[in-house]
Amino acid sequence: MPESICSRAAREAGLSPSDLERLVGVARSAADAGGQELMRHYGRLSSIKNKGRSGDLVTNADLAAERIILKLLAEQTPDIAVLAEESGAAGQQDGLRWCVDPLDGTTNFAHGYPFFATSIGLTFGQQPLLGAIAVPFLKEMYWGAPGIGAFCNDSPLQVSSCERLEDS
């Protein structure tokens, strides 16, 4: 079986399996902290603004969750750059980089629909390495990394062995 894009990126970044385990733990903690902050604001928004494009919203919950996530990432991984949806990029952008969407599904959130998430990913260059997605209303955390697997909470996800869509 050929090496996955994520596995190759992890190798090129010089990350050991224990590094990946630690970083996926950081991603999970950050996603969980962001999701908890979103739930504190759910149904109690004090600010909803249009970011410029029609239908592209930002709320006080987006901003509050992003602040908490960025603080946690800076404390636990100060040498890793960040690209965050609301505040933009910080740090060297060609190595390891956290990609943060503090409120994925802002429109749903703003309308009181419970289908929203906090998404945290780690990339090396343009290649994905690992990710964690907290769906706080459903109390679910999806996460995964090469060599570790993909999970919902702590239950392994089963993926198809089919490699081509037309064969599925």
For every predicted segment, state its role.
Residues 3-6, 11-15, 121-168:
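Acidic beta-strand-loop-alpha-helix segment within the catalytic core
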